[in-house]
Amino acid sequence: MATIKDVAKMAGVSTTTVSHVINKTRFVAKETEQQVLQAIKNLNYSPSAVARSLKVNTTKSIGMIVTTCETPYFAEIIHSVEELCYRQGYSLFLCNTQNNPEKIKNHLDMLAKKRVDGLLVMCAEYTQNSLNLLAAFEDLPMVVMDWGPFNENTDLIQDNSFSGGYIATKYLIDNGHKDIAIISGELKKTTAVMRYQGFEKAMQEANLAINPDWIMEGFFEPEDGYECMNKILVQDKLPTAVFCCNDVMALGAISAIGEKSLKVPDDISVIGYDNIHASRFFSPPLTTIHQSKSRLGVQAINLLFKRISEKGKEHEIIEIYPELVIRKSVKTL
């Protein structure tokens, strides 16, 4: 493999001159520059990314810590982040953690060795262990996305899940539904709690009782929606509507309803959350709460780029508000 010394020898210049041509750190005569570039081409020389980063104090790379990239919601956000990084000339190191503190630590250590310019964090839940690990990297420009806590060392994007849960439930109530079930995520996790509390507030404002037998907890997967819906369907009294706290659980719930020879929305209405790309192709097309994944990703990465270039600025909280998307899975009573 060719070295910078080989390039200098072929071009008939010093290694310092080669370095200036590569890093554009000083004026070099046009003829000399062309000789160096031709030598680089002839030798197929590739400058060391690490060595260059030490000189210009940037690696043009971003680390992204996520719970998983498999779920449609996370995948759509990651896609928007990766696309913008690519357009800005940045590499993206994507690290799946499954909320495992050991994995988080190992990934953070790896990203530190890579000398990434900044860090995006998007986890389904933030344990004290993971918060402590992130705190150790407080000097690194960092944006916490979606459900993370705010502290003075990070920027934060909030998705207002409470508002989304409220909007979804109020829409069902406004369409005449009084017997409403909820299929939630784990109620020990922030995003599930916030969406449930929004549901609870809407029910209380309408003076409607919440049936404890219709409060189901899953893990935001389609099989959870399916299993939770089946637990509801074996009860003597059925709800007229179900609020599923994400779209993939709504898909599972719709499947369970169909297997009992019932129809959505004629027999049971279903509303989801997230407005994933596939939700408009459900049968029937799913009424849901829209949380712009592309906007969330773009806001986060732009905020991080801003933090990288203006490290001394006061940290920010940016809020993104959910919106109702009406399709065909909710019946008016």
UniProtKB/Swiss-Prot annotation:
Domain of life: Bacteria
Pfam families linked: LacI (PF00356), Peripla_BP_3 (PF13377)
InterPro entries from the UniProt entry: HTH_LacI, LacI/GalR-like_sensor, Lambda_DNA-bd_dom_sf, Peripla_BP_I, Tscrpt_reg_HTH_PurR
PROSITE patterns the record matches: HTH_LACI_1, HTH_LACI_2
GO molecular function, one term: transcription cis-regulatory region binding
Pathway(s) where this gene product acts: Purine metabolism; purine nucleotide biosynthesis [regulation]
Keyword DNA-binding attributed: yes
Annotated residues for binding of hypoxanthine: 73, 189, 191, 220, 274
DNA-binding region location: 4-23, 48-56
Domain HTH lacI-type: 2-56
Alphabetical UniProt keywords: DNA-binding, Purine biosynthesis, Repressor, Transcription, Transcription regulation
GO BP of this protein: negative regulation of DNA-templated transcription; purine nucleotide biosynthetic process
Keyword set includes DNA-binding: yes
Described function: Is the main repressor of the genes involved in the de novo synthesis of purine nucleotides, regulating purB, purC, purEK, purF, purHD, purL, purMN and guaBA expression. PurR is allosterically activated to bind its cognate DNA by binding the purine corepressors, hypoxanthine or guanine, thereby effecting transcription repression.
Domain notes per entry: Consists of two structural and functional domains: an N-terminal DNA-binding domain, approximately the first 60 residues, and a larger C-terminal domain, approximately 280 residues, which imparts the function of corepressor binding and oligomerization.
Subunit structure: Homodimer.
Protein name per UniProt: HTH-type transcriptional repressor PurR
Organism encoding this protein: Histophilus somni (strain 2336) (Haemophilus somnus)
Taxonomic path: Bacteria, Pseudomonadati, Pseudomonadota, Gammaproteobacteria, Pasteurellales
